[in-house]
Amino acid sequence: MSPQTETKASVGFKAGVKDYKLTYYTPEYETKDTDILAAFRVTPQPGVPPEEAGAAVAAESSTGTWTTVWTDGLTSLDRYKGRCYHIEPVAGEENQYICYVAYPLDLFEEGSVTNMFTSIVGNVFGFKALRALRLEDLRIPTAYVKTFQGPPHGIQVERDKLNKYGRPLLGCTIKPKLGLSAKNYGRAVYECLRGGLDFTKDDENVNSQPFMRWRDRFLFCAEAIYKSQAETGEIKGHYLNATAGTCEEMMKRAIFARELGVPIVMHDYLTGGFTANTSLAHYCRDNGLLLHIHRAMHAVIDRQKNHGIHFRVLAKALRMSGGDHIHSGTVVGKLEGERDITLGFVDLLRDDFIEKDRSRGIYFTQDWVSLPGVLPVASGGIHVWHMPALTEIFGDDSVLQFGGGTLGHPWGNAPGAVANRVALEACVQARNEGRDLAREGNEIIREACKWSPELAAACEVWKEIKFEFQAMDTL
């Protein structure tokens, strides 16, 4: 029997190409509590109407393709298709629109950030009808949130593990980031922890290079942790970077860290990938390890205002995939971060319920139900003069991380750590006494300098250092 080559009109299938908006633009649609909602910033090519552009995004990120196909008739597109349900122009921008798309929950595998992103931010970002496309925000329904473990432990459990309350945690990234031997690296870790820091950190690109193999680093850092704990009576930690070329090697490093009895490991979640990150987060919960997350590569994805993925989406994805800390920008340091927008996604990381607030870039109300919170990490170009602002901006549930601002102290690493700890304790005490950190911050630091020569020396070195550039990440 030869295959059928002709189609009769009565079959109901009409081959060819039709406008996306005929199927995927549905302004009358009422969103469901179970829908994943997305806000895209869409820049259509000249001559492409916004309705067609928004519908194309909905189609290409869900069930659509460039032409009608026979197999459309074998399923229910009304049940599974994405829908562009609202479009609004972007104020102050020509030919840019916020297009809202609703996705049925059945399109996504449970507990998989990888699958969710493969659909929503997949091939559609290379679509020719669009000049540029940026995912500004996602609303994750509670039905989907509950399919994720999320952070291995969360903020309160971490505080209980560390026995540290009522203040931000203090950290330091060991510098130079590359080139130190394992023994010298461990020495720097010890000096910083002995001086008063809670944590030290592997830089994100420290994995297992010829000058310092991972096992040697882990051993010397563990020795530094135990020695500093014995001398200070405080629980200490070092973010041992378990990121590796394969998931198997990553897990081997995490297992060795657990065997050493250290409290925390680290992962570069964007370069390492969401599948690897989620696997590591599950291991960390099962084995009592905290998980510090670095966002290396994020600016490639999120820095351009009209194309890519906003970091608030990457932050939500991390909370779902799993991490106890994540770098979030500083507002005041050397790296990108506008205050209101930064605090918007900081709240998305920490709080259980966040109301829609467009002034802070939050497009949807988000309910995290029982998913634990994540500590934001302020890191990058910060020093003791920034301490009042950081304490006021980020509050107690944060990690303030000074790399060069510790190791660059003129008297050495331990005095650098002392200076940061004294500055933090002074700011917390002043705040608790009702003083205004934003207005009196410099005075508070100067007062503390009178009884801390280490802090006075740090203040003298960095008194003129500022990073005053306009933020790219604006509303």
Curated annotation (Swiss-Prot):
**Species:** Oenothera argillicola
CDD domains, A to Z = RuBisCO_large_I
Q: Where is this site: Transition state stabilizer?
A: 334
Q: Kindly list the positions annotated as binding Mg(2+).
A: 201, 203-204
PTM info: The disulfide bond which can form in the large chain dimeric partners within the hexadecamer appears to be associated with oxidative stress and protein turnover.
Q: Which PROSITE patterns match?
A: RUBISCO_LARGE
Q: How is the cofactor bound?
A: Binds 1 Mg(2+) ion per subunit.
Q: What is this protein called?
A: Ribulose bisphosphate carboxylase large chain
